[in-house]
Amino acid sequence: MQKNIIDELTWRDAINQQTDADGLRELTEKKSISLYCGVDPTGDSMHIGHLIPFMMMKRFQLAGHHPYIVIGGGTGSIGDPSGRKSERQLQTMEMVQHNVEALSGQMKRLFGEDANVSMVNNYDWLSKISLLDFLRDYGKLFNINTMLAKDVVASRLDVGISFTEFTYQILQSVDFMHLYKAHDVQLQIGGADQWGNITSGIDMIHKIEGSETEVYGLTIPLMLKADGTKFGKTAGGAIWLDPEKTTPYEFYQFWLNQDDRDVVKYLKYFTFLDEAEINELAKTVETAPEKREAQRRLAEEVTRFVHGQAELEGAQKITEVLFSGDIKALDVKEAEQAFQKAPTVEITAEKKNIVDFLVDAGIESSKRQAREDVQNGAITINGDRLRETTLEIDPSENFEGKFVIVRRGKKKYFLARVK
């Protein structure tokens, strides 16, 4: 028997707070509901931190409920103060619109073009509210003392908060009200820092529609790694869903390298594997951690969900090739993914003696050092270890003549591009 969606989320430890646990469980058992989660277009790509609430939305979708994804073209032009220590820099409306289109495309890839999901932009209704209507119809329902007590505002009082950001919780409440009246949306989902905004919306709906109105709020836990640091950030920055910002190979590697202490939690949050499968993988973490079976399955599932089967297979191939050293097995696209972070140097297309090639590219500082490294076996060209200083390098032989991959020593790679 299939679990109720609330029970499913509970065993996955995916719920932080909810306004009425029993009421929401009962509602989701007796009918298919509509629910929503919003994302403001502060950039042109989501990162993996955004995946957490939207994985929850996907679970509701698979359980037969109807998610509404709200792209905040209106609220994004104002700026959400949640989780911020300082005022956001306002974006131009052109930039907001560009980001709206980019995020909408990502959402369609995650949820499917024809699936039981709706994409809406809150600019469509917020932009139609005049200032006088906003103050009379909505502002009158909000008590300043209550607003000041919300964590999102209280945490900013010492450094200051603009009236613009102060009113953000009202705008988010208007979103919930609009979606409830227009589409019978009864549940809002958000991150842990959205609790105050979500409860403000519920309070407003109760004031307008009556206290018995069945609307609910649910937040996800703040995601921290076992070492106490914030999930989703690396030394190189955020892990993006856009393959142009974070390649599928880098994305796959991020999940593959997760700590044993975190991997079971992430399997619950970020995959659709059932309880029995996750429990089996949890056992392997205890009995054979060196095999990293749980990490490999996590990387496979999340990369497939975000980037698709073909990109997953490409990431796996790159991983295997870099381990074996058979670099020529990669095609041009795969090689560029694999060595995207390697230093890039420029070379010409003509054949050159290996010593001259290394010095002219700036990989070696002198011909003497180049000869020494070649003779000692410290140089590989496109995966081949070369020891003869008389050899010639022909850039046209591999990778469509676009580049040569050079390794000096055990780990130092260079991407030598033909100019």
From Swiss-Prot:
Residues 352-419 form the S4 RNA-binding domain. One of its GO terms (cellular component) is cytosol. Its EC number is 6.1.1.1. L-tyrosine binds at residues 36, 168, 172. HAMAP family: Tyr_tRNA_synth_type1. Homodimer. This is Tyrosine--tRNA ligase. It comes from Latilactobacillus sakei subsp. sakei (strain 23K). The lineage of its organism: Bacteria, Bacillati, Bacillota, Bacilli, Lactobacillales.
